[in-house]
Amino acid sequence: MSTARFIKCVTVGDGAVGKTCMLISYTSNTFPTDYVPTVFDNFSANVVVDGSTVNLGLWDTAGQEDYNRLRPLSYRGADVFLLAFSLLSRASYENISKKWIPELRHYAPTVPIVLVGTKLDLREDRQYLIDHPGATPITTAQGEELKKAIGAAVYLECSSKTQQNVKAVFDAAIKVVLQPPKPKKKRKKTRPCVFL
C-alpha cells in the first residue's frame, strides 16, 4: 500500500473574510460563532478525491497587517493557495489584486491559486444587507472576472455557516495539485499563401 501524497494548502486573504471559519467548517463540520483573529494554525486530514487518498495539510494565516513579515514564512513548500475574499466586502475583493497577488507572486510565483468568495449565505440575506447599508455584494460574474485577471486556476463561492460548497473548495484545491491545468498553447501566426 502506498503512502498518501502530502499536499500543503495555505489560506490567504484579508482579516475577517472567513478563512478560519472555512477551515473549521471543513475539518469539523461546525461553524464558530466568535471571531478570533488568527496567528497561525495548522490542520491535517486524509482526504479521498477521485479515488486518490491525499494527506491534506491546511495552513491558516492571519490577514492583518501586523503579520505582514511573519505570514510569508508559511508559504514555503505550499502546493496550492486558497485566496479568499468576502462576497460582502469590496475592500477585501480589491485587495486580492492590490495586496495578495503581489505578495503571493513574490514569495511563491508558480504555486496555483484557488480564488474563493466567502460568506455566500449573506449575499442574498436581506436582513444583513439592511443592517449593513455599506455592504456592496460581489457578484459571481465579478468573481470570475477577477479569477481571469489574476490567473487563478478556479473560482468558487462558499458559505462556512451553511457548508454550501465548502467541500468543493478543498476538492478543487486538491485537484489543481493532482491534475494541474494544461498550459494553453499559443497559436502560431500563419501567413496566408500567396500564389504568383
Curated annotation (Swiss-Prot):
Where does it mainly reside?
cytoplasm
Q: Which parts of the sequence bind GTP?
A: 13-20, 60-64, 118-121
Q: What is an example of a GO molecular function annotated in this UniProt entry?
A: GTPase activity
Kindly list the places in or outside the cell where this protein is found, as annotated in its UniProt entry: Cytoplasm; Membrane
Cellular component (GO) terms are:
cytoplasm; membrane
Where is motif Effector region found?
Answer: 35-43
**PTM sites of type Cysteine methyl ester:** 193
Q: Which Pfam families match?
A: Ras
| Covalent lipid adducts (S-geranylgeranyl cysteine), residues | 193
What membrane topology is given? Peripheral membrane protein
* GO BP term (any one): small GTPase-mediated signal transduction
Prodomain positions: 194-196
Q: Does the keyword Lipid biosynthesis apply?
A: no
Q: Provide the alphabetized UniProt keywords.
A: Cytoplasm, GTP-binding, Lipoprotein, Membrane, Methylation, Nucleotide-binding, Prenylation
Check the record and name the PANTHER family matching this protein. Answer: RHO FAMILY GTPASE (PTHR24072)
Q: What is this protein for, i.e. what is its function?
A: Inactive GDP-bound Rho GTPases reside in the cytosol, are found in a complex with Rho GDP-dissociation inhibitors (Rho GDIs), and are released from the GDI protein in order to translocate to membranes upon activation.
- According to its UniProt record, which protein family does this protein belong to? Belongs to the small GTPase superfamily. Rho family.
* Record protein name field: Rac-like GTP-binding protein RAC2
The species this protein belongs to is Lotus japonicus (Lotus corniculatus var. japonicus)
Report which gene this protein is encoded by: RAC2
